């Protein structure tokens, strides 16, 4: 049975799914209103060391870098419309392959060309992040984002992190007004 999380809530993967080795992180959303322009949201992952920064550019997984250099995290591809039910974009994580110096993997969704298109998360509804045991396709945890993020153009949906030798997942729901560039700058990537 899937654990439904509220903002800030967390779940121990070793308790919720003790045998899980491979995680599918599914992210979804719907464009509430548009002016006819494309509304392209992009999921990405950042593999963070204990200092809260990436170890290098290869720890930023997104549509132009689909797999981490160690193969532990893979982006399954860019969905440019967000149309339809279910996951709009997803990432796969091999928990046993994540390097020991990676303490946390954060999952961020950004709006492509948000400033030029005058788009924000205020025009997005039904946003969610879910963790699925990729070995048996059982949903382990889900967080439905409900906050009004009227000016934000990037959103940290959730994070996988190590705590006392086990993996946990936390629902975050933190918005950023500066889009992908501000998220990259915070975690040690030069996005220019």
Curated annotation (Swiss-Prot):
The keyword Phosphoprotein appears for this protein: no
InterPro entries: Stress/Tellurium_Resist, TerD
Record's keyword terms, sorted: Plasmid, Tellurium resistance
One GO biological process term: response to tellurium ion
UniProt cross-references to Pfam families, sorted A to Z: TerD
Keyword Ribonucleoprotein: no
UniProt similarity note: Belongs to the CAPAB/TerDEXZ family.
Function: Not known; seems to contribute to the tellurium resistance (Ter) mechanism. Also involved in phage inhibition (Phi) and colicin resistance (PacB).
Protein name: Tellurium resistance protein TerD
